[in-house]
A protein has these predicted regions:
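Distinct, well-ordered alpha-helical segments
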Residues: 58-60, 82-84, 117-125, 144-157
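Acidic-and-aromatic substrate-binding clefts and catalytic sites of carbohydrate-active enzymes
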Residues: 27-30, 48-52, 113-116, 141-146, ...
Length: 258
């Protein structure tokens, strides 16, 4: 019989819902308003790439928009690990707890809060042993969030599945010129089909401005950005960058922002 409602889409383009494989819906790195923003732009399925898991689950009843959402819990000092060299037992505890509470897996935030190379390698293998999805913002205490960090991550994956986050983050000209870095990144991805990735189109770099008790910036990526624009990597540098408009503070709800 006839439909209850007919929507005339003459002249429009219809397509399936978009799958966004890298979003941030938690208060630490994104905003609880993220689900609504995604839905308004045609996204129906997404992968949150850091959590915090409990924060997103708590806010979903109020801020959710009916999206299919998978969440990776962040595996990172000084938050879910106390140091940058956690034991394997600590890794197993975090991974198992995250999976039991609803996470799809874990993500290493190496570019921001690096672990040692050895620990990073062990964490990836441990996550896979526990049948957890594992992603990595490339970077360790030996190599940062750049092309060298990406090369290191590909080598550490050693043929095993790994989601290497936002590939263009490693092609900003820190080691070679941007075109050569992008060419190398594409060659690495083509040569290593076990690695899957994505890229973003925003000209801005979203990161945290928080400082530790010593006044030093906590995120290595934020430090890189401050240094690039000639600011010190501390609370004073953040203030000056904000005053000069080199850094913008984007707020979600109270106590939420990046």
């Amino acid at each position: 019989g006839p439909a209850r409602e007919v929507i005339d889409v003459s002249g429009w383009v219809l397509q399936p819902g978009i799958i966004d494989s890298h979003v941030h819906l938690g208060s630490m790195w994104g905003s609880p308003y993220g689900p609504r923003m995604l839905a308004m732009n045609g996204v129906t399925t997404c992968l949150d790439m850091a959590g915090p898991l409990d924060d997103i689950l708590e806010k979903t009843p109020q801020y959710g928009a009916g999206l299919n959402t998978a969440i990776l819990q962040f595996a990172s000092p000084p938050f879910t690990f106390k140091t940058n060299a956690p034991s394997k037992a600590e890794m197993v505890e975090l991974i198992d707890k995250s999976l039991a509470e609803g996470a799809l897996g874990v993500k290493l935030l190496g570019g921001h809060y690096p672990l040692t190379p050895e620990v990073s390698s062990t964490l990836i293998k441990t996550a896979l042993e526990r049948r957890a999805y594992v992603a990595w913002h490339a970077g360790t205490s030996a190599h940062g969030s750049n092309l060298e960090g990406m090369i290191e991550a590909v080598q550490m994956a050693d043929g095993y599945p790994l989601h290497l986050a936002h590939i263009n983050a490693y092609c900003r000209g820190a080691i070679k010129n941007e075109i050569d870095e992008a060419r190398t990144a594409v060659e690495l991805l083509n040569a290593n089909p076990n690695i899957f990735s994505e890229s973003y189109i925003s000209p801005k770099n979203g990161t945290r401005l928080t400082c530790g008790p010593d006044g030093k910036i906590q995120s290595q990526v934020t430090g890189n950005c401050l240094r690039h624009f000639g600011f010190t990597e501390d609370r004073d540098g953040v203030r000056k960058a904000l005053d000069m408009g080199a850094v913008y503070r984007a707020m979600g709800i109270k106590k939420a922002g990046r």
